[in-house]
Every structure is written in structure tokens, then in C-alpha cells.
Amino acid sequence: MLAVTACGGGSEQGSGSGDGKGKDSTAARSTQSEARVTIAPRDGAKSVETSGELKVTAARGKLTEVVVKNAKGKAVEGAISKDGASWTPSTHLAASTAYTVHAVAEDAEGRTTTQDSRFTTLTPKETFIGHFTPEDGSTVGVGMPFSLNFTRGITKPDDVEKAIRITTVPAVEVEGHWFGNDRLDFRPRTYWKAGTKVTVELNLDGVEGRDGVYGEQSKKVSFTIGRSQISVVDAKKHTMKVIRDGKVIKKIKVTTGAPGYETWNGKMVISEKLTVTRMNGETVGYGGEYDIKDVPHAMRLSTSGTFIHGNYWGGDAFGNRNASHGCVGLRDVKGG
């Protein structure tokens, strides 16, 4: 009886104590989320690649928030997948930069869990930049592209092009075109509309342009499209029409490339203006055929040496015959 009583008394106390622990444990389980968050790279990682390594995933739940920032508070753009299972960045990361990651996930019962992490991206041994035109704050013509000349040949053009964002007011579709592996131009399919405001964001810092070679530019450039002025040269008729805002305002007699030195066809943009310059045939593969030290009013049309320029030595060629080595010549006087 004593034994039974003792057992009975112990069971009741234990039962009371046991129920208490059971309730506490159940309560804890009811508030703790079953969702689990995993962040890659690991917390504290260093020399992390700027592309491909950052990813956040959730198990037994869905991600509801992911914020990745650098030390200055600038957020990394990214998106949570439709099923809530993962988050990936939509762009590369900057090089030599410390980042923090804050992620939140919830389970089927709506209970949340959070995970925080830090890491630092790699410091490149080799880098590249893009020299660009037009300059920030400039006003340019309706045919002017935004042109980048890179200091290293680019073997990952899609990644580099993706890192350049162009916005315009009014909105217009702008396309990129590569010339070889070191030049990239952006322009609309037709001429710009006069008055268009163009903003270019160069987010090249950290983008891998070729194996082991990373961009180092992070810059914003803005320029404005001025009035519409287009000059149309007819090499057969030896004339040039100047069209401003859709109206012909002037017709000029010209001379273009002689037989064997024909002027290139197509649309070309004036990219440089020189009051006076020297033109030497040696620089374009024409040997000693000419060396004119004071060519007036020279305007560059191509990187290969095609210009439209003043000409004081052409005699009666203007409007009558083509006599140049490929340039478009207009009657001018010595010294401009």
C-alpha cells in the first residue's frame, strides 16, 4: 500500500511536472518556424567571385525578404523565385566590396525565421575601363552614338553589355553593336529625336570582361541631343545637301574619293572637329602621296582616317570631279 501510495504520489507530481514541460515544449515548437535559410557564400567568406556565387535558398518554407547591401547601404538588385525557394542577384557584384545579407523565410504556418551573413568580394589583379564619347554634359547631333573603347579585348561581351544601362527622355529603344572585341556603340535604330535627354549608367565595376580581367568603372553620364542637322553627299553629282530640321538649307559643291580611293558609303558621324590639322598619307597606308600640314576645318568621320574638310588646293574639282584620297572636300582658303 505504501509502495502503491508512493508510486501514486510520484506519478501525480511527475504528471504535473511532466505536463508542464510538455506544454512548454509544445509552445516552443508552435512558435519556432520550420523554415530553414541557407546563404552562399558562407558567413565571413573572402575573395568571393563577383558573379555566380551569391545565392539564398529556403527549405521547408518560402523566402519573403532578401536584402543584400554594401557598406554604403546600396542594395543589390535581385529577385525571389516564384516558388519562394531561392533568391539570386540580377547583376554582378562590385569588386573589393564588403556585403551584408539579411534573409527572411516563413513556413506553412506563417512562422518566420531570419538569417544574416557577411562576405567580401575579390580584388582583381587585372582590370579594364572603357573610354567613352560623348562627354558628360555635352550636346551632340542626332546621329551620335554612345561609344565605348575598352582598354582590353572583351571575350564576354554579353556580360559587359548587360552592365551598361541607358535611359532616355522621351523613351526610345537603344541597341548595342560591337565593332571587334574592344568597341561597343549604343544608338537607336534611326536618328535620335532632337531634344532627347540620354543617361548612361556604367556599372562595370566587378564585371568580368575576359577571364581574370574585371571592370573598374562605376559612373553615370548624361548628354542631350541637339537640333537635327544631316548632310547628304552625292559622290556622283559632286554635291552635298545640308538638311536642318527636315529642310534643305544649303547645297555645296564637293569633291570625294577618286577612282581607286572611293569615299565609303553609309551613315557616318562627326566625332571630332579640328580648326587646322596635318594629313599625311603615311598614316593611312598611302605612302608619300600627300603630306598637307594645314588642312582647314577638318571633321572626323571614321577612325580609319575619313574626314570632311576644307580644301584650298583642289582647283576646279569641286562640283566637277572626284579627286581626293577618300575624304569629302569643300572649297576653302589656306589657313581657313
Residue positions per predicted region:
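Acidic, low-complexity Ser/Thr/Gly/Pro-rich repeat segments typical of extracellular/periplasmic
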Residues: 1-227, 254
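Short, solvent-exposed loop/turn elements at domain surfaces
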Residues: 65-67, 157-159, 240-242, 263, ...
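A structural motif detector for short, solvent-exposed N-terminal "entry" segments of globular domains
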Residues: 219-260
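Short beta-strands and strand-coil junctions in structured, solvent-facing domains, enriched
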Residues: 154-157, 208-210, 239, 260, ...
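Post-signal peptide N-terminal regions of Sec-secreted extracellular proteins
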Residues: 120-129, 142-143, 258-261, 265, ...
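Active-site-proximal beta-strand/loop segments in catalytic clefts of secreted hydrolases
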Residues: 235-236, 243-245, 254-257, 271-274, ...
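Extracellular/periplasmic catalytic domains that process cell-envelope and extracellular macromolecules
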Residues: 177-179, 193, 223-225, 232-235, ...
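Exported/periplasmic cell-wall-interacting domains
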Residues: 142, 265, 281-336
